[in-house]
Amino acid sequence: MIQVETMLKVADNSGAKRVQCIKVLGGSKRRYGSVGDTIVVAVKECMPRKKVKKGDVKKAIIVRTKKPIYRKDGSTISFENNAVVLINEQGIPIGTRILGPVTKELRKKKLVRIVSLASNVL
């Protein structure tokens, strides 16, 4: 569950390392976001000479959460950190690689481009 002010790790090679959630998109009173949801983030920490700069405001898609994801077969999956992938205004990922695992729930939400960039899908 991601809410406003949550600090997140960036799981791609766009240049940002840490971002902070500004808004969870999808309704005026929506408080929490989970895997596959779109949020607005501010870049807090980044690498030099990359595509994004500190202070940039970008959209991102949540790919990993600490909160368990319950599946229909009775299994659960959770990760050790909260992570996002930065996207542009058209919904295309800014980075060219995704580091770490992502969940197969992203494929159900029609985020196939992110799943194809990921090294492993759980």
UniProtKB/Swiss-Prot annotation:
Keywords: Mitochondrion, Ribonucleoprotein, Ribosomal protein. GO terms for biological process: translation. This is Large ribosomal subunit protein uL14m. It is found in: Mitochondrion. Pfam families: Ribosomal_L14. The gene is RPL14. One of its GO terms (cellular component) is mitochondrial large ribosomal subunit. Belongs to the universal ribosomal protein uL14 family. GO terms for molecular function: large ribosomal subunit rRNA binding; structural constituent of ribosome. Its main location: mitochondrion.
